[in-house]
Amino acid sequence: MLKDRENILSALREKPAKTYQLMRRANLPNEEACQSLLLKMRDEGLVKFDIHKGLWEIG
């Protein structure tokens, strides 16, 4: 799980992305697990979600 977090953060350093794009860049096979991890990271303040654009970005 720690490796998945690192993969997500490195993917977001390139540019903000939608969930499916993040899954491809971070090499995560399960969309549900990816969304769950993103929500946990959002609660911790590591990432933000722009509701108007539908993009995840580094917090």
Language-model features and meaning:
Residues 25, 36, 54-55:
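Residue-level "edge-of-site" marker
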Residues 1-2, 49-59:
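Short, cationic-aromatic polyanion-contact patches
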Residues 11-15:
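Short helix-to-turn junction characteristic of helix-turn-helix DNA-binding domains
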Residues 45:
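Glycine-centered, phosphate/nucleic-acid-interacting loop/turn motifs that mediate DNA/RNA or nucleotide
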